[in-house]
From Swiss-Prot:
Function noted in UniProt: Phosphorylation of dTMP to form dTDP in both de novo and salvage pathways of dTTP synthesis.
A Gene Ontology molecular function term of the record: ATP binding
Gene: tmk
Protein name: Thymidylate kinase
A GO-annotated cellular component: cytosol
GO biological process: dTDP biosynthetic process; dTTP biosynthetic process; dUDP biosynthetic process
Binding site for ATP: 11-18
Main enzyme class: transferase
Length: 217
């Protein structure tokens, strides 16, 4: 059986990933593609408990290395229990954030550096990398204003200062420059419908290639 495709969505707080995830699901359904929708951190019962630890308040503050290791602990469980089984069944997997977020948030944002994240990535994932990453690129100020406008209590990350998110944004930009074939930038500072149109165009381009057999895993 042919392994399923692995698609990830990335972006800062307020980038619109939840809405984008719905559009991706709807597009794949129209193509008759069986897709599993999931998220990180989380995606499994244990992963969701780790998510609560990561997003909840921590006093004294959680150490950056602890944060990174918890992210990869949740990811390891997610891969073992949900992502790999689905891919091996031939299902496609669409994940709200994956390891690019660890590079951006812990590698750049927390200052741990890409080398440490890469070591955890190789150990946890082996050779598995997403086939396509849709990066919803939103200016920091715009994203944080949108997140604040949801009217929900901010989580531990959303309470960070703007400088943290500027570093995270720099991380995503560096990754997009390094992996231009995999990471497709979508300007998420546009009006919503324009964002979703651009997102679907980037997705459709990749899906068309895959379904035509012109691009192997």
């Amino acid at each position: 059986m042919t392994r399923g495709r692995f698609i990830t969505l990335e972006g800062l707080e307020g980038a619109g990933k939840s809405t984008a995830l719905t559009r991706v699901r709807e597009y794949l359904q129209r193509q008759g593609i069986d897709a599993v929708m999931t998220r990180e951190p989380g995606g499994t019962p244990l992963g969701e408990r780790i998510r609560a630890l990561l997003l909840g308040q921590s006093e004294p503050p959680m150490a950056p290395a602890t944060e990174a290791l918890l992210m990869f602990a949740a990811r390891s469980e997610h891969l073992d229990k949900r992502i790999w089984p689905a891919l091996e069944r031939g299902q496609w997997v669409v994940c709200d954030r994956f390891t690019d977020a660890s590079y951006a948030y812990q590698g750049w944002g927390r200052g741990l550096g890409a080398e440490r994240i890469a070591a955890l990535e190789d150990w946890t994932q082996g050779a598995l990398r997403p086939d396509l990453t849709l990066w919803l690129d939103v200016p920091v100020e715009t994203g944080l204003a949108r997140a604040a406008g949801r009217g929900e209590a901010p989580d531990r990350f959303e309470q960070e200062r703007d400088g943290f998110f500027e570093r995270v944004h720099e991380g995503y930009a560096a990754l997009a420059e390094r992996f231009p074939e995999r990471i497709r930038r979508v300007d998420a500072g546009q009006p919503l419908e324009a964002v979703l149109t651009a997102l679907e165009e980037a997705l459709a381009s990749a899906v068309t290639r895959w379904l035509s057999g012109t691009e192997a895993h």
